[in-house]
Amino acid sequence: MLSQLRGKIIVAVLIGLAVVVVLGLFSDLRQVGASFQQFNWAMIPAILGFTLLNYGLRWLKWDYYLRKLDMGHGVSRGASGLLFTSGMVMAVTPGKVGEVLKSYLLRTMNGTPVAASAPIVLAERLTDGLAMLLLMGLGLTLYPPARPLFALLVVASAAGIVILQFRPLCERILAQIGRMPFGGKIAPPLTTIYESTRHLLWWRLLVVATAISVVSWFGECIAMYYVLRGLGIAPSWYLLLVATFVFAASTLFGLVSFLPGGLGVSEATSTGMLVVLVPMALGPATAATLIIRFCTLWFGVTLGAGALAILSRRYQLDQRPPEEQSLPANEAADPKIA
């Protein structure tokens, strides 16, 4: 497994390096270098601390989903933490969909079918997106051009949740798929995926998970604030609002771009908005973007690689592919929600 992932991670790292080079060429390299030299590196512990707060709370959300769907049998809290952290190595995949790796690892640990647990990753991404929309909404008055896309994402998210909760329509679609050629093979796992997804988007779970996401991602918004403070920007509530809006918007735009890790889109959005809203010169804005990306995205990828290496040794993932095991039907297709 690790041998297959290494190539993908290396490609993502190369893309990330290319983004750094392009940003450097687009900006004044001397200004960027000067900004790094002037940066107050004593801010790094606070920046990484708030990033770790985000990771910790998101792990709680992952574990909350796991226990609510009765899929955590045989998985200790520590193992759950390693499992969650290992998924962060796939944060550089398009839309973070590669984090379904957690489902394969969970199958190895306790036999939970991938089709049953994969919707947890979908629910994580959806609630993260909703949290980003809420955080971004706090600063919409700062940047009116972002309003149309914000409205579109709100409508699309609401429509998707409503459609998934409308069971007759979804069951009709699944029945049609089952009657198609080869549909008999994919309809059962799709039904399992739908049942898990529908329960995960039940309003009480949705509200709790979204609330956790808002608090967790606000931690990284505060990390962005400390990056700007490290570059010498005077502290103020306005600066915190700008940091929250810029980080949330750039992360969200990167997510919906479906580029690996949002690479390129997130960086360009963040740099451009910092220039307009702080305001600050292009060189320092580029430095701020690079620092926050290394302290969030790439920090998480590094932690994920370490956690995955531990799990690989523990479960010998390189020696054998995980075998598919089945749960009892009532656990796979009828997860509990209370």
What do the PLM-derived regions correspond to, one by one?
Residues 86-94, 115-140, 290-302:
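Membrane-embedded alpha-helical segments of transport systems
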Residues 77-80, 100, 112-123, 280-291:
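Membrane-interface alpha-helices at helix entry/exit sites of multi-pass transporters
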